């Protein structure tokens, strides 16, 4: 699968300046056919009160990846908005960083579905997410 829009990782990361994405420290790290990847630190910004990665931070990473991937699959003048996010948390993470990998499940004219898997630094699956998006425009 080829992306419909051609952007560099630098351009993707620049688009996140002064947003929640930047505040959480999310950085896009890989863009290739059918895969968008990003990393997020596990630190005070993303911890819950017990010192573990907050489930909402994992969800924010997933929605960030799925929404950007969805936009990369639209035509000029179109955008995507999230319609549903499901997250299943498999294991805790207390420090370091996590990596999210986003791949398409369904790419329709009006809707898309994305799977985002979050891994810890040892490559263990920590969270599995599915994001639904609507294509507007």
UniProtKB/Swiss-Prot annotation:
Function text: Required for optimal enterobactin synthesis. Acts as a proofreading enzyme that prevents EntB misacylation by hydrolyzing the thioester bound existing between EntB and wrongly charged molecules.
Lineage of the species this protein comes from: Bacteria, Pseudomonadati, Pseudomonadota, Gammaproteobacteria, Enterobacterales
Domain of life: Bacteria
Protein's UniProt name: Proofreading thioesterase EntH
Family indicated by similarity: Belongs to the thioesterase PaaI family.
Pathway info: Siderophore biosynthesis; enterobactin biosynthesis
Key words of the record: Cytoplasm, Hydrolase
Cell compartment(s), UniProt: Cytoplasm
Gene: entH
Record CDD domains: PaaI_thioesterase
Enzyme class: hydrolase
The species this protein was found in: Klebsiella pneumoniae subsp. pneumoniae (strain ATCC 700721 / MGH 78578)
């Amino acid at each position: 699968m080829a992306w419909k829009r051609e952007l560099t990782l630098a351009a993707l990361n620049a688009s996140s300046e002064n947003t929640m994405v930047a505040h959480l420290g999310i950085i896009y790290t890989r863009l290739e056919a059918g895969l968008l990847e990003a990393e997020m630190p596990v630190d005070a910004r993303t911890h819950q009160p017990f010192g573990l990665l907050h489930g909402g931070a994992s969800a924010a990473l997933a929605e960030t990846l799925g929404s950007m991937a969805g936009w990369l699959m639209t035509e000029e003048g179109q955008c995507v908005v999230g319609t549903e996010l499901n997250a299943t948390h498999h294991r805790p993470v207390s420090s370091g960083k996590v990596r999210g990998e986003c791949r398409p499940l369904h790419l329709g004219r009006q809707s898309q579905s994305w799977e985002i898997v979050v891994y810890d630094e040892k490559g263990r699956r920590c969270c599995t997410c599915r994001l639904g998006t609507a294509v507007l425009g």
